[in-house]
From Swiss-Prot:
Its main location: endoplasmic reticulum. It is found in: Endoplasmic reticulum membrane. The gene is CYP89A9. The lineage of its organism: Eukaryota, Viridiplantae, Streptophyta, Embryophyta, Tracheophyta. The chain crosses the membrane at residues 6-26. GO terms for molecular function: fluorescent chlorophyll catabolite monooxygenase (deformylase) activity; heme binding; iron ion binding; NADPH-hemoprotein reductase activity; oxidoreductase activity, acting on paired donors, with incorporation or reduction of molecular oxygen, NAD(P)H as one donor, and incorporation of one atom of oxygen. Involved in the chlorophyll breakdown by its action in nonpolar primary fluorescent chlorophyll catabolite (pFCC) decarbonylation. Involved in the formation of major chlorophyll breakdown products, including non-fluorescent dioxobilin-type chlorophyll catabolites (NDCCs), during leaf senescence. Pfam families: p450. This is Cytochrome P450 89A9. Heme binds at residue 454. One of its GO terms (cellular component) is cytosol. One of its GO terms (biological process) is chlorophyll a catabolic process.
């Protein structure tokens, strides 16, 4: 009887202390400030009144009034936005394990990601670690990246041909982004499936990927009360599932073809996925299983999308800068001429091993990523448990995001931030040791930061340097007479592209 009483008292004391701790936690820490909200619908009415189409401008205005961390309510759940780089570092780097989770996916996203079985959407845990480790250790390690150098040269030849053809047929370049995306897709399809695909095959995969991409908005209504829409909107659900089935059919054709090959010159992403085993439960040493066909499709789709669009968009911005500011283009070219003095006429390509000598080129690319990051927000993060950031409550049931575009334009860290000035990334004419990972300090984060940082950021930087260097080495880029390069931005899916694509004439620099 005495032992039972003691155990009861201990349990009661612990329960009471936890209760008091929770009461104290929630009474001393409140959500970050934000605009007025209504029950159930949150801030939607307020956002519509304040030009929701310019969401970044709305957030910037709210931050100027409420401070560097604000709360919006879309429905009943809080969505927290951070504009301050120090708070971003505190969350993503110093407390990365807490701020690295993902929310449960919406019904349509669950279909597209095979129930969150890709790197981007998977919750923070053993599955996410397994998928990310497979990509970084098998495909993105330096020796494997180097093995694909011939692939990059091949896609560069495709890109050059696209530009030369348009210049010859139209008299100028106006579809730069389409050409850049197309050439990058050739490269990424080769890295993914291990095969140089024909033009019609590439177009088929591109179309399947594009249709799934636009489905996020086209079928978003299916995520509203899904138990109801599955009954009332059966035809729309059927259309959406047929779209996914079509994508799976296209991609699995190349996955299955690769699985039948006994040898391959270079390891491709599909090779690693066919051999990968993923955990069936969170605990270490638990049971494992092979990926399903649908999961392989989701991972291949993620690989193609994540490595194509942001890189192509950044290249568009960089080449627009070259056209708008001829002096910057001249400096990039003169640097290459100096480095390769005496061999200009014989050298047809700037090789990857030469890129480390091109400090000014690297500075131009970093400045463009600062001024025009391909995405102005990260994907939504979620905390693993209720926590505090900047003195405010960050609840587990909400989401938190970080305004990448604003951090790269912070006048407290960047002098004259709206001016394009590559020299800020140079020290005595040499490229400075800039920490892109934000480990020591976040000054800008075009690839994110912390545990969820883009695993392919180094590959993306290599692609930007290699393709831009060769486009400037092969051609002089000039603005079309009577045209101006407009650097206004607009959101397109997840990337920030040029509102008005630039037009240019290209002139071969050597015969």
């Amino acid at each position: 009887m005495e032992i039972t009483t003691i155990i009861f008292l201990i349990i009661s004391s612990l329960t009471f202390s936890i209760f008091l701790k929770l009461i104290f936690f929630f009474s001393t820490h409140k959500l970050p400030p934000g605009p007025p909200r209504f029950p159930v619908i949150g801030n939607i009415i307020w956002l519509k009144k304040n030009n929701f189409s310019d969401f970044q401008g709305v957030l910037r205005d709210l931050a100027s009034r409420h401070g560097p961390i604000i709360t919006l309510h879309v429905g009943s759940k809080p969505s927290i936005w951070v504009t301050d780089r120090s708070l971003a570092h505190q969350a993503l780097v110093q407390n990365g394990a807490v701020f690295s989770d993902r929310s449960l996916a919406l019904p349509t996203t669950k279909v597209i990601t095979s129930n969150q079985h890709d790197i981007h959407s998977s919750v923070y845990g053993s599955l996410w670690r397994t998928l990310r480790r497979n990509l970084t250790s098998e495909i993105l390690q330096p020796s494997r990246v180097k093995a694909h150098a011939p692939s990059r040269k091949w896609s560069l030849e495709i890109l050059v041909d696209l530009f030369e053809t348009e210049q010859r047929e139209k008299g100028h370049i106006s579809d730069a982004l389409d050409h850049l995306r197309h050439a990058m897709f050739y490269l990424l399809a080769l890295m993914c499936f291990g095969e140089k695909l024909r033009k019609e095959e590439i177009r088929e995969i591109e179309e399947a990927q594009y249709q799934m991409l636009i489905s996020y908005t086209k079928f978003s209504v299916l995520n509203i009360f899904p138990s109801v829409t599955k009954f009332l909107l059966r035809r729309k659900w059927k259309e959406f599932l047929e779209l996914r089935k079509s994508q799976e059919s296209v991609i699995l054709r190349y996955v299955n073809a690769r699985s039948k090959e006994t040898t391959g010159d270079v390891l491709c992403y599909v090779d690693t996925l066919l051999n990968l085993e993923i955990p069936t439960e969170e605990k270490e040493g638990g049971k494992k299983r092979k990926l399903s066909d649908s999961e392989i499709v989701s991972l291949c789709s993620e690989f193609l999308n994540a490595a194509t669009d942001p890189t192509a968009t950044s290249m568009q911005w960089i080449m627009a800068i070259m056209v708008k500011y001829p002096e910057i283009q001249r400096k990039v070219y003169e640097e290459m001429k100096t480095v390769f003095a005496g061999e200009e006429e014989e050298r047809e390509e700037i090789r990857e091993e030469d890129l480390g000598k091109l400090s000014y080129l690297k500075a131009v690319i970093l400045e463009c990523l600062r001024r025009h990051p391909p995405g102005h927000y990260l994907s939504y993060h979620k905390v693993t448990h209720d926590t505090v950031l900047g003195g405010f409550l960050i609840p587990r049931q909400g989401t938190i995001n970080f305004m990448v575009g604003e951090m790269g334009r912070d006048p407290k860290i960047w002098e004259d931030p709206l001016t394009f000035k590559p020299e800020r990334f140079l020290e005595n004419g040499e490229a400075c040791d800039f920490d892109m990972t934000g480990t020591r300090e976040i000054k800008m984060m075009p690839f994110g930061a912390g545990r969820r940082m883009c695993p392919g950021y180094a590959l993306s930087l290599l692609h930007l340097e290699y393709y831009v260097a060769n486009l400037v080495w092969k051609f002089e880029w000039k603005c079309v007479e009577g045209e101006e390069v407009d650097l206004s931005e607009k959101q397109q899916f997840i990337t920030m592209v040029m509102k008005n694509p630039f037009k240019a004439n290209i002139y071969p620099r050597r015969k």
